[in-house]
Amino acid sequence: MLGVQKKRSTRKTAARKTVVRKPAAKKTAAKKAPVRKVAAKKTVARKTVAKKTVAARKPVAKKATAKKAPVRKVAAKKTVARKTVAKKTVAARKPVAKRVASTKKSSVAVKAGVCMKKHKHTAACGRVAASGVKVCASAAKRKTNPNRSRTAHSWRQQLMKLVAR
C-alpha cells in the first residue's frame, strides 16, 4: 500500500461560478440646448404724437481755402557786444635746419658723427662701441643691412612716419 497514493476526493457537482454582472453601458444622451420660452408680447396701443415740423437746413457753401504754408517767425537777433579777448603771444618757432644730403664721405667719418636713427639721443640710447664710435642701441646697423628684406607692413609703417612728419 505504500506505493499507491490515496486518491483525493473530488466534488461530483460542479461548483457554480459566481457571475459578475457588468454594469449596463450608459448611453451619453446628446445635450439639447435649453430652449428659452419667449414671453408672448402684448400689443400696446400707441399714443399718437404730434410731429414737429423741422425747417430743412440749407447746405453751407464751403469756401475752398488755399492752404497757407506755415510761416516761421524768425526771432529778432540781438546785437551782442563782443568781449575783446587778449591775444596770447605765441613764441615764434624757429625754422628747423634741414640737413643737406652731403656727398658720400668715407664710411668711417660718417659713422663717427651721426647715428642712423633720426631722434634725440638719450643716455640709455647710446652705447660706445669697441672702436669708440657712438652708435644708437636700437640696431642702427639694421637699416643699412643689405640682407634685410622688407615686408609690406614695414613699408606702410615707414610711410605713416613720413606723413606724420
Curated annotation (Swiss-Prot):
Mind telling me which InterPro entries this protein's record contains?
Answer: HC2
Ranges where the record places region Disordered: 1-80
Q: Which domain of life is it from?
A: Bacteria
Q: Which Pfam families match?
A: HC2 (PF07382)
Q: Which UniProt keywords apply?
A: DNA-binding, Repeat
Bias-annotated ranges (Basic residues) = 1-50, 59-80
Q: Name one GO biological process term.
A: chromosome condensation
Named from the GO MF annotations, one term is: DNA binding
Task: State its role.
Answer: Might have a role in establishing the nucleoid structure of elementary bodies.
The entry sums up its family as follows:
Belongs to the histone H1/H5 family. HCT subfamily.
Protein name from the UniProt record = Histone H1-like protein HC2
